Amino acid sequence: MELTTKLVGTCSALDRLYQSGSAKCLFPRNSRAGLEAVLLNTAGGVTGGDRLSFSAQVRAGTRLSVTTQACERAYRAQPGETGQVRNHLSVATGARMNWLPQETILYDGSSLDRRLSVEIEPGASLLMVEPLVFGRIEMGESLNDARFCDRIEITRRGRPIFLDATRLQGGIAAHLAKPFIANGAGAMALLVYLAENAEAVLPRLRQMLPECAGASLIGEDLLVMRVLAADSFLLRQSLLPALRLLNNNEIPRCWTI
């Protein structure tokens, strides 16, 4: 799927959309936060051999918020097969990009390789979150044999300003149970906020975080937050106030349904 924004007067609008396969996109009309795009995977999830990609160009002066209609699911994969997800965002000067997908749920036996790359110009801003849930906790599922590889790269003027990589393989539940890894957490999230007011909002953000979360300023305009939680419900209790603080008290409606 490929998506490009444009300015119509003072409003952000859709300029170009290309979609194929199981990837579909909806555009709610009641959004006050510029153009909102809701991604759907009509296949219901990702399994071994799947190839999904999304690309967005957020042009100068426009505002785009991207979310998902529901949680993405990484299903059990056949041996030797891996599902691939590739997302690429390009944010021009004066533009704002909100990358706010709902949780990705890893099933036991799943194999997922995911990449997110963001090219951001000076004067642009970004709010992104990637929530992750380790198994169907309410069903008693434990990740005894799964594979998850994730890489996030944010560049400005061709230079990396944020790189993050996660690699979990095999007995993920046993690994996360270690006290100095995740102490048995069933969910986690990474949040990145790149904006001129990043330093100013950091004290307020820290005040609302639980003990199993932390936020730091790693650049003059770059804030990073990480959260661990027992399950997705508690994870959202930490994420939603943070998203409201960093996004003018707005979150996508899909997050509240």
Curated annotation (Swiss-Prot):
State the Pfam families in the record.
UreD
| Keywords associated with the record | Chaperone, Cytoplasm, Nickel insertion
Q: Where in the cell is it found?
A: Cytoplasm
Example of a GO MF term = nickel cation binding
- InterPro entries this protein is in? UreD
Tell me its family: Belongs to the UreD family.
Record-linked PANTHER family? UREASE ACCESSORY PROTEIN D
Q: Tell me, what does this protein do in biology?
A: Required for maturation of urease via the functional incorporation of the urease nickel metallocenter.
Q: How does it assemble?
A: UreD, UreF and UreG form a complex that acts as a GTP-hydrolysis-dependent molecular chaperone, activating the urease apoprotein by helping to assemble the nickel containing metallocenter of UreC. The UreE protein probably delivers the nickel.
The protein in question is named Urease accessory protein UreD
The opening ranks of the lineage are: Bacteria, Pseudomonadati, Pseudomonadota, Alphaproteobacteria, Rhodobacterales
Name the gene for this chain: ureD
